[in-house]
C-alpha cells in the first residue's frame, strides 16, 4: 500500500481529523455487514473518532514503513496538542473514496512478476506485471494500467490466481 489512513463512511467520520496524520492519502470506505462487528465501526457509531493506519507492508517487517506510521501518530498527537514534540509536517492528505480506486485483476494463474510498485505513476496501457507459466517459463498474461494514475496497492506475493486483485490505482484526479 501507499501509506494512508482509512475511515469507514458512517455519519460520524471526520476526514479533517484523518488528514492530521499527514499521510499521502485519507481513504473513506463504505462499511460492509462484517464491519458492524468491529470495534472501529462501533467506536464511530458511539461518537468516538476511529482511524486505521496502513503502512507499506502488512505481512513483512518493514522498518521504514513502521517509522512512517509512528511519525504519523506523533504528528497527529502534536497537532491535537496532546504532545509537544516537533514532528515533520508530512503530506497534505488527498481524500479518496475507496470505490473510486481502479482495480486491475489477473487474467491467468501463475507466477506474478510486478513491473511497478506502490506510489509509482503510471500511464494508460502501461504494463504493470507479467504472469508467467511456472512449467514453461513463458509469459501467459500481462496486466496493464486502465488509466493514468498512481499505484495505491500492489500485490506482493509471488503466486497469483486468476481474477485476483493485483493493483489498485488512484485515477488521475484532475481530468
What is each model feature region?
Residues 1-175:
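Structured catalytic-domain cores with a bias toward divalent-metal coordination
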